């Protein structure tokens, strides 16, 4: 039995991992799916000041409060940054780090830096008053038409600072086992770049035929890879 902590990407909440939670639980694992501040049930009132550092610390505190050890920490998309920082901050608790179409941090760079100019333009186009960002177009998430309405009604704004706060200059990955699950075909240059980088840095890389949000479009297949 393993202990999984599943962390959602931008605009979402712990709800997005529901079917993966069910599948892993049936396989005998313990599953946690926390919701980052200002997301999920609290999406109507996100805090604009929340950034990468605060989200990482929030996740570290969650692991401590729950008394979790021997954790497999799974981050999707944006949460690749959050989970990587949390794993580095709490190496005694996190033994395995898995990124699902996740963004790998680089010291001194923020999400927007890593994603490049096209993302910067999209970020500006989706900016809301008060330092928030509205969700990307639905097709960016790669969910099926059957799940589209259910998925979209649960999305909410996300703090701009989360995309613009840089990773600490002294960041280094922990010694935890690392795996990257690439949802193919990758829809953006960023996701292809992340998969290639993970492979070049010696991560265990797995391909999954799925849309970007594999926990919605291919939950059983994703659960099988995590298991």
Where in the sequence are the language-model features?
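Catalytic His-Asp charge-relay segment
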Residues: 176-182
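Active-site loop/oxyanion-hole signature of alpha/beta-hydrolase fold enzymes
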Residues: 30-32, 36-72, 88, 112-117
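Gly/Ala-rich beta-loop-alpha elbow adjacent to hydrolase catalytic centers
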Residues: 74-79, 83
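Flexible "cap/lid" loop of the alpha/beta hydrolase fold
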Residues: 48, 88-134, 189-190, 195-197
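Conserved HGGG/HGGXW glycine-rich cap/lid loop of the alpha/beta-hydrolase fold
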Residues: 2-43
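Conserved loop-alpha-helix segment in the C-terminal half of the alpha/beta-hydrolase fold
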Residues: 183-216, 221
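Active-site nucleophile elbow and catalytic-triad environment of alpha/beta-hydrolase enzymes
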Residues: 153-172, 186
């Amino acid at each position: 039995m393993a202990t999984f902590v599943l962390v959602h990407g931008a605009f979402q909440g712990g709800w997005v991992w529901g079917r993966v939670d069910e599948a892993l639980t049936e396989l005998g694992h313990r599953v946690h799916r926390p919701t980052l501040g200002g997301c999920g049930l609290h999406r109507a009132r996100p805090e604009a000041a929340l950034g990468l550092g605060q989200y990482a610390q929030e996740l570290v505190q969650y692991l401590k409060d729950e008394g979790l050890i021997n954790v497999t920490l799974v981050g999707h998309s944006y949460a690749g940054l959050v989970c990587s920082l949390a794993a580095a901050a709490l190496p005694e608790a996190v033994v395995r780090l898995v990124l699902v179409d996740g963004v790998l941090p680089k010291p001194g760079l923020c999400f927007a830096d890593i994603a490049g100019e096209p993302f910067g333009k999209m970020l500006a186009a989706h900016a809301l008053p008060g330092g928030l960002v509205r969700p990307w177009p639905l097709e960016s998430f790669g969910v099926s038409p059957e799940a589209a309405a259910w998925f979209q009604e649960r999305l909410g704004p996300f703090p701009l600072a989360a995309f613009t706060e840089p990773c600490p200059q002294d960041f280094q990955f922990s010694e935890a086992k690392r795996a990257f699950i690439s949802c193919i075909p990758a829809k953006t240059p960023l996701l292809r770049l992340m998969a290639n980088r993970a492979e070049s840095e010696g991560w265990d890389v797995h391909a999954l035929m799925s849309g970007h949000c594999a926990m919605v479009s291919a939950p059983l297949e994703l659960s099988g890879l995590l298991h």
